[in-house]
Swiss-Prot record:
UniProt keyword annotation of rRNA-binding present: no
Record's subcellular location: Cytoplasm
GO cellular component terms attached to this protein's record: cytosol
Molecular-function GO term, any one: ribosomal small subunit binding
GO terms under biological process: maturation of SSU-rRNA
UniProt name for this protein: Ribosome-binding factor A
Presence of the UniProt keyword Oxidoreductase in the record: no
Database matches in PROSITE patterns: RBFA
Keywords, ordered alphabetically: Cytoplasm, Ribosome biogenesis
Pfam family, one: RBFA
């Protein structure tokens, strides 16, 4: 497993904050709707960034949101170039984050198991 570098983590955090602001204020695509950015992973050379997101409607809205985000990726990247001072602005890859849904399912299973005993 590669070692995490503090600068890479700081850049990922800044990319997440700027993208959240841009998506909320600049993107008017109705497919995107209410999404939450849960994390960003940037490669060490800053060429790629995986942006993890969740949607308010769960899996039903995830596919539509992914299409909208992929369509807006070029615009978001160009806007990031004006807000972040990096020599290379990372290419954005949007990935639906299922960890919250899995956590809710596990919590329900635990509650059911505790309730049966």
């Amino acid at each position: 497993m590669p070692k995490d570098f503090s600068r890479t983590l700081r850049v990922a955090d800044q990319v997440q904050r700027e993208l959240a602001s841009l998506i909320q204020n600049e993107i008017m695509d109705p497919r995107i709707g209410m999404i939450t950015l849960t994390g960003v992973e940037v490669t060490r050379d800053y060429t790629y960034a995986k942006v993890f997101y969740t949607t308010l409607g769960g899996n039903e809205n995830a596919q539509l949101a992914e299409e909208g985000l992929k369509r807006a990726a070029g615009f978001l990247r160009s806007q990031l170039a004006g807000k972040i001072r990096l020599r290379i602005i990372p290419k954005l890859q949007f990935v639906y984050d299922e960890s919250i849904e899995r956590g809710i399912k596990l919590s329900r299973l635990i509650d059911e198991a505790v309730g049966k005993t």
